[in-house]
From Swiss-Prot:
Family designation: Belongs to the arthropod CHH/MIH/GIH/VIH hormone family.
GO biological process, one term: neuropeptide signaling pathway
UniProt organism field: Procambarus bouvieri (Mexican crayfish)
Name recorded for this polypeptide: Molt-inhibiting hormone
Localization per Swiss-Prot or TrEMBL: Secreted
Amino acid sequence: QVFDQACKGIYDRAIFKKLELVCDDCYNLYRKPKVATTCRENCYANSVFRQCLDDLLLINVVDEYISGVQIVGK
């Protein structure tokens, strides 16, 4: 799934793919289905997505990902 119907912002396949990869990697890290589904809630604008960024050691590029969330989730 590359496009989430809950996202009402600009459709950008590259951004969706990048955000989706964070949730996929986070799921692979913890192997808990709830992590995968919760990470995608509210078009990635949630605390689990932020925690996944931290857990995947993406702290230095958090702003880039949050900007992507804002673009697709308006």
